[in-house]
Design a protein with these regions (language model features):
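Active-site loop ensemble at the mouth of alpha/beta enzyme cores that anchors a bound cofactor
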Residues: 232-233
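Conserved alpha/beta-domain cores
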Residues: 2-198, 204-206, 212-214, 226-228
Length: 233
C-alpha cells in the first residue's frame, strides 16, 4: 500500500451539506415526536447551474424547487432524462399566463394566491390531464410587498380551488423577516387544520428546524445546501 493510499484510507468522510441538513431535520422531528419521513426536503436550486445540482442528485436528493418557469424549463428536462424520479416544485410567484407551462413541468405548485391563477391552473389541468399538487399561499404577516392571499380571503380561495379541481395539498407561507417565525408557523398550522388540510410548506434555511417542530411537511432549503445564491442576467 502506498503512503498516498494509506493517508486517503485514514481520512474521515466529509459530511456533506445535504447530509447535515437531513440530520438537522431528523433531530427537529424527534423533538416534536415526529418521523423524519414526514418532512419533505425541497432543495431550492433556483439560480444555480446544473453543475451545482448534479452533486445533490448523485447523493440521492430527488425533490427540488425552482422560482421561475422559464429557468426550470432550461435546466430540468435534460436532468430528468437521467433522473426520471425527480419531483419538481414551483415555489415562486406564478403569472396566470404561465399556468399551462407550469402544469406541464412541475409536480407541485406552492404559491397559488389569487382567483385568477386558480382559474388559469384549473383550465390548464383540464386541458393537459396533469394535476400537480397545489399549496395556497397565505400572506401570514399581512405584508403588502409579499404575495399570498389575506387570511380573511383564504376560505373563498380554497373553495375556488376545490371547485376548479385543483388538488389542494395544503398551505404555504413566508413569515416576516427578522422576527421570531414560530407564531406565524403556528398560525399557518391552525389555518390548515381549520380547513381540513394537512400540508404545510414553511421553513427555509434560517428557520426550518423551528418549522419542523411546529408541523412543517415541506421545507424549502436553498443557501444551506448550495451556498450564496447565483444571479441571472
Amino acid at each position: 500500500m502506498t503512503e498516498m493510499n494509506s493517508t486517503a484510507d485514514l481520512a474521515p468522510h466529509a459530511v456533506t451539506p445535504l447530509a447535515a441538513i437531513r440530520d438537522r431535520i431528523a433531530r427537529a422531528a424527534a423533538i416534536a415526536g415526529r418521523k423524519p419521513a414526514e418532512v419533505t426536503l425541497i432543495a431550492v436550486s433556483k439560480t444555480h447551474p446544473v453543475e451545482a445540482i448534479e452533486p445533490l442528485l448523485e447523493q440521492g436528493q430527488r425533490v427540488f424547487g425552482e422560482n421561475r418557469v422559464q429557468e426550470a424549463a432550461e435546466k430540468w428536462p435534460a436532468l430528468r432524462e437521467r433522473y426520471p424520479d425527480v419531483a419538481l416544485h414551483l415555489i415562486g410567484q406564478l403569472q396566470s399566463n404561465k399556468a399551462a407551462d407550469a402544469v406541464a413541468l412541475f409536480d407541485s405548485i406552492h404559491a397559488v394566491d389569487r382567483p385568477s391563477l386558480v382559474k388559469a391552473l384549473g383550465k390548464a389541468m383540464d386541458e393537459s390531464g396533469r394535476r400537480p399538487d397545489c399549496f395556497l399561499q397565505v400572506n401570514i404577516g399581512d405584508e403588502p410587498q409579499k404575495g399570498g392571499c389575506a387570511i380573511a380571503e383564504l376560505p373563498a380561495l380554497l373553495e375556488a380551488a376545490r371547485t376548479a379541481g385543483l388538488p389542494v395539498a395544503g398551505l404555504m407561507c413566508l413569515p416576516p423577516a427578522d422576527v421570531e417565525p414560530a407564531p406565524y408557523f403556528a398560525l399557518l398550522g391552525k389555518l390548515a387544520r381549520d380547513h381540513g388540510l394537512t400540508g404545510l410548506s414553511m421553513g427555509m434555511s434560517d428557520d426550518f428546524e423551528t418549522a419542523v417542530t411546529i408541523g412543517a411537511t415541506h421545507v424549502r432549503i436553498g443557501s444551506a445546501l448550495f451556498g450564496a445564491r447565483g444571479t441571472r442576467a
